[in-house]
């Protein structure tokens, strides 16, 4: 390093989120402090990738030195560890933007999720990605000297901070391109001022990085004694992991490479490494994380793969190679068929891109299908984290709709649990003889679904019903209309017909009862007028006096509530009021000669049905009043 302090020094305050992150990180990640080295070496590797990419169009950026690498030197007497790279470097504005602020959307949302539980916080912070700030886990002060490739030597920058409220930035002179990070180690960080400790950490975390990582070691004579001289020794293999044969790569290497590309702290759930030659030559390495990113449902969430062309890094977060519902997938794709000067705009409408996207999508679906069949417990872990976004795939990926549908999991009346463990294939296997539809119910919650009066007839006949209570489910069922040749049927729709599961004597008895109750139905319809679409008898209830249902082509209750919650105008849902002629309360209502009291019975039964269906009612005071008036007659 050859730097001299020049001028233009200023002190600036950290963005408030940075201060909070530094505090939390130092206390939550202390037990895993060696990750600071992984993060800083990973950043140095990224800086080299970016220089290679920009030098494609401007070779002068190499400044006569295209041998890229990372070097680590420690000084026990000065208590410092220095990590140096000769990558792209940073300008003054870059330093302020990247080292003084957290340039991520949804940061406030992230911090709102933090608690006082250190293990949970460390997991969240790991998902957020700490990068450069991890230096403060082991250092009580950090100095960064950097010069962006292409800038003059006297336009270099020095950044210094003790990781508290502020930092200083000043212009310096630096002859060499790239970045030097000097860590002034805490007492607890001094273990890293040791050649063998550094060797161990580099081998563990950075073997897969595609550029040399070297440390300054002592020269020894033939007898093994130190001569007092120093030399640089490369520690890692410096071969891009995805270019190696799968048989040569250990599970631990795959796991560490995942942490490098994702900046996640946890091991991935599974991965798929493939090299394809033919119409398109490419290598893909795709990982499924164990935990969902904290901001996965955020509209601005960055997702996508790292893109390499002929082993040259092109861009991060290339979203064009994965459908949106697979935005949790991490990894990379290395293509031989895309141009080196490819841009996001070119990727958008490129046949090669579309072909690679289709291939990567199928790889992930195959991975998940294999997991679902061979490791149910692991797949359930995946579903808990990513089930909501997978449901988007039914609408988004028409080409793979049946495969995506086969991966969905739901609760059902077969399993007395809110856990979503039932696949559609297993439901179809259990269908009753003569059953040709997949029955489902949507509700606000598992409890509401499980206790819905609409289930009474199905339980009595031993017919399984899928229970859906995620907010996305009603929307999902607009697109998921059949599976394995079986149509889906909502059990809250008026067109429901279970007559095939009834014997002739039962049908005849129902017909007689329906005729007897014809006048009661007409009387109820006359009282309610156009408040309901229709009044009719039903025999699908056992312990419930009445329910409301919608026409097959009418908007369902859950969809209406979803749109209302989104602030959209929703047309009034006209319900069909179905009364159970075999229930004691309905018989009591039918026997009532006083029209005023009859009307109160109607109000109470309709109010109950609306409350069970919607969870609320427009005029609860009218409902309560009708109940009170009836109670005074008891």
Swiss-Prot record:
Subcellular location per the Swiss-Prot or TrEMBL entry: Cytoplasm
Pfam families in alphabetical order: HATPase_c_3, HSP90
Keywords (A to Z) from UniProt: ATP-binding, Chaperone, Cytoplasm, Nucleotide-binding, Stress response
Domain of life: Bacteria
A single GO cellular-component term on record: cytoplasm
Region annotated B, chain positions: 345-561
TM helices/strands, residue ranges: none
Residue numbers spanned by region C: 562-634
SUPFAM superfamilies (UniProt xref): ATPase domain of HSP90 chaperone/DNA topoisomerase II/histidine kinase (SSF55874), HSP90 C-terminal domain (SSF110942), Ribosomal protein S5 domain 2-like (SSF54211)
GO MF annotation, one: unfolded protein binding
Stretch list, region A: 1-344
Main localisation: cytoplasm
PANTHER family associated with the record: HEAT SHOCK PROTEIN 90 FAMILY MEMBER (PTHR11528)
NCBIfam families (alphabetical): PRK05218.1
HAMAP family: HSP90 (MF_00505)
Sequence similarity: Belongs to the heat shock protein 90 family.
Record's subunit section: Homodimer.
Protein name: Chaperone protein HtpG
Species for this entry: Vibrio campbellii (strain ATCC BAA-1116)
Native organism taxonomy: Bacteria, Pseudomonadati, Pseudomonadota, Gammaproteobacteria, Vibrionales
Gene symbol of the encoding locus: htpG
């Amino acid at each position: 390093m050859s730097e001299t302090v020049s001028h233009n020094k200023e002190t600036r305050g950290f963005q408030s989120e940075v201060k909070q992150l530094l505090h939390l990180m130092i206390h939550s990640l202390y037990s895993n402090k060696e990750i600071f080295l992984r993060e800083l070496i990973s950043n140095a590797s990224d800086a080299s990738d970016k220089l290679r990419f920009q030098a494609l169009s401007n070779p002068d950026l190499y400044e006569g030195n295209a041998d890229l690498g990372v070097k680590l030197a420690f000084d026990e007497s000065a208590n410092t560890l220095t990590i140096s790279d000769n990558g792209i470097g940073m300008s003054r504005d870059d330093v302020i933007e990247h080292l003084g602020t957290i340039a991520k959307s949804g940061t406030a949302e992230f911090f709102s999720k933090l608690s006082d539980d250190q293990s949970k916080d460390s997991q969240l912070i790991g998902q957020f990605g700490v990068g450069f700030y991890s230096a403060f886990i082991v250092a009580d002060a950090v100095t960064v000297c950097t010069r962006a490739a292409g800038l003059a030597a006297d336009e270099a920058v020095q950044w210094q901070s003790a990781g508290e409220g502020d930092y200083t930035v000043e212009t310096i002179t630096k002859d060499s391109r790239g970045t030097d990070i000097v860590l002034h180690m805490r007492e607890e960080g001094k273990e890293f001022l040791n050649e063998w400790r550094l060797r161990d950490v580099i081998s563990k975390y950075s073997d897969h990085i595609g550029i040399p990582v070297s440390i300054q070691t002592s020269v020894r004579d033939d007898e093994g004694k130190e001569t007092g001289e120093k030399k640089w020794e490369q520690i890692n293999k410096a071969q891009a992991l995805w270019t190696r044969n799968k048989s040569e790569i250990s599970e631990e290497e795959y796991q560490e490479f995942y942490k490098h590309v994702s900046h996640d702290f946890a091991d991935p759930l599974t991965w798929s490494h493939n090299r394809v030659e033919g119409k398109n030559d490419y290598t893909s390495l795709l990982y499924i994380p164990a935990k969902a990113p904290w901001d996965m449902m955020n509209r601005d969430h960055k997702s996508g793969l790292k893109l390499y062309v002929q082993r040259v890094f092109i861009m991060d977060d290339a979203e064009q190679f994965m459908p949106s519902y697979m935005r949790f997938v991490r990894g990379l794709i290395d293509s031989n068929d895309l141009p080196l000067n490819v841009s996001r705009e070119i990727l958008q409408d490129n046949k090669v891109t579309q072909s690679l996207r289709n291939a990567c999508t199928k790889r992930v679906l195959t991975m998940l299908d294999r997991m679902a069949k061979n490791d149910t417990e692991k797949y359930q872990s995946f579903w808990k984290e990513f089930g909501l976004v997978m449901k988007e795939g039914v609408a988004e990926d028409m080409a793979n709709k049946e495969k995506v549908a086969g991966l969905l999991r739901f609760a059902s009346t077969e399993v007395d649990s809110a856990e979503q463990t039932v696949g559609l294939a297993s439901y179809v296997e259990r269908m009753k003889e003569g059953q040709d539809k997949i029955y489902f119910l949507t509700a606000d919650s598992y409890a509401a679904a499980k206790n819905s009066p609409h289930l009474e007839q199905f339980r009595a006949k031993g017919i399984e019903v899928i229970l859906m209570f995620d907010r996305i489910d009603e929307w999902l069922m607009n697109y998921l209309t059949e599976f394995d040749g079986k149509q889906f049927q909502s059990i809250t729709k008026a067109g429901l017909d279970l007559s095939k599961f009834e014997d002739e004597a039962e049908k005849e008895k129902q017909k007689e009862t329906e005729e007897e109750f014809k006048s009661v139905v007409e009387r109820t319809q006359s009282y309610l007028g156009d408040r309901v679409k229709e009044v009719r008898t039903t025999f699908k209830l056992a312990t419930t006096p009445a329910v409301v249902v919608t026409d097959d082509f009418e908007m369902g209750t859950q969809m209406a509530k979803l749109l209302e919650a989104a602030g959209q105008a929703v047309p009034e849902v006209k319900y069909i009021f179905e009364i159970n002629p075999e229930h004691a309360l309905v018989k009591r209502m039918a026997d009532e000669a006083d029209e005023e009291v009859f009307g109160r019975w109607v109000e109470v039964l309709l109010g109950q049905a609306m409350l069970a269906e919607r969870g609320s009612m427009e005029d609860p005071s009218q409902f309560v009043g009708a109940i009170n008036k009836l109670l005074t007659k008891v």
